[in-house]
């Protein structure tokens, strides 16, 4: 019987492995429920049950544990923010808040199900990402984050610092109480042309890099997800200093292939290859088209330090047989 932990250990060490593994994940509840685990216990239970069902059906090579239900940050979720100055009302909630304690219990219950069989990574959003997601997913305002950020960068940076301080504790405590292998950190550039490189270096990098430093203190194997999809794009140059060991970006959205990205990120381990948008190859292609694509993908990118995955989260409706096929093709075309 295949030892998936040994397989992924080789891959995460950028070594030649018997096959190219796969890594796909999806959400378990609606966007608004992403923020509601503490007020509705059924949300948390659906996410826990969903992970267990996903593991049983998909038999993944490793697991990214979704933070569905714990998106955002309690102070953001419970503070009326209409103008940039309101961001100064965002405060750290501290180590005893239910958002800390219940989230750790939630991760542990999921993780204990399969951590002895596969590598596990817990999803953490960068401090600024926590704010953006609440405005966009819960309030439905896709322009608010950039508008307030550009209106008063210091106020947004202050709010992000409050969240970063809580994330430091959460991450450290997760590794003390849960047998996690690493963190999957989701980051994104500010979606506004006025937020240039110097803006990111002054207002985005400090809290992002603080979170990364905390993550690296806890584990050597972590995944950086540069979140792009649809109209959300990223300049990969903004993330050159984000020194985590495995990189996942939107190869299709950013028009940067696995081979190009692996070279750009100094030969780090990379995850990706498939567009995650609906009615694309992953969900709509034939088996023959999938095989031709993977053959071409691996001939181009190579098979050392490569994991076949997608730009971002995928639809939960894709039949599990598709992932079984991709896994077999990763073995067939391993050089």
Regions inferred by a protein language model and the residue ranges of each:
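Membrane helical hairpin/interfacial module
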Residues: 48-72
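N-terminal beta1-alpha1-beta2 module of alpha/beta enzyme domains
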Residues: 41-45, 49
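Active-site loop segments of alpha/beta catalytic cores
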Residues: 1-29, 33-38, 50, 61-65, ...
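Active-site gating loops and adjacent loop-to-helix segments of metal-dependent hydrolytic enzymes
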Residues: 83-91
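Glycine-rich loop at the start of a catalytic domain that most often binds anionic cofactors/ligands
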Residues: 34-38, 73-82
């Amino acid at each position: 019987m295949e030892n998936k932990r040994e397989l992924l250990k080789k891959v995460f060490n950028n070594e030649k492995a018997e096959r190219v593994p796969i890594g796909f994940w999806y959400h378990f509840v609606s966007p608004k429920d992403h923020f509601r685990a503490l007020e509705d216990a059924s949300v948390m239970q659906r996410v826990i049950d969903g992970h267990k069902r996903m593991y049983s059906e998909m038999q993944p090579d490793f697991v990214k544990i979704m933070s569905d239900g714990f998106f955002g940050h309690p102070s953001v979720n419970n503070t009326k923010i209409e103008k940039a100055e309101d961001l100064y009302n965002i405060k750290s909630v501290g180590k005893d808040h239910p958002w800390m304690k219940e989230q750790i219990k939630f991760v542990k219950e999921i993780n204990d199900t399969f951590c002895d069989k596969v590598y596990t990574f817990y999803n953490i959003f960068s401090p600024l990402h926590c704010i953006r997601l609440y405005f966009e997913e819960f309030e439905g305002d896709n322009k608010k984050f950039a508008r307030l950020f550009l209106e008063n960068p210091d106020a947004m940076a202050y709010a992000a610092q409050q969240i970063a301080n809580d994330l430091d504790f959460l991450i450290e405590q997760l590794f003390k109480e849960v047998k996690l292998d690493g963190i999957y950190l989701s980051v994104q550039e500010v979606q506004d042309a006025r937020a240039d490189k110097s803006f990111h270096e002054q207002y985005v990098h400090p809290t992002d890099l603080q979170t990364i430093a905390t993550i690296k203190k806890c584990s050597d194997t972590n995944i950086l997800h540069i979140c792009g999809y649809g109209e959300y794009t990223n300049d990969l140059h903004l993330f050159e200093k984000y020194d985590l060991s495995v990189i996942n970006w939107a190869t299709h959205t950013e028009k940067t292939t696995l081979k190009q990205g692996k070279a750009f990120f100094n030969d780090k381990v990379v995850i990706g290859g498939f567009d995650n948008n609906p009615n694309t190859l992953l969900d709509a292609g034939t088996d023959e088209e999938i095989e031709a694509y993977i053959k071409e993908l691996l001939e181009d990118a190579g098979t050392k330090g490569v994991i076949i995955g997608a730009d971002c989260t995928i639809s939960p409706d894709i039949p599990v047989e598709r992932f079984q096929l991709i896994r077999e093709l990763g073995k067939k075309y391993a050089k």
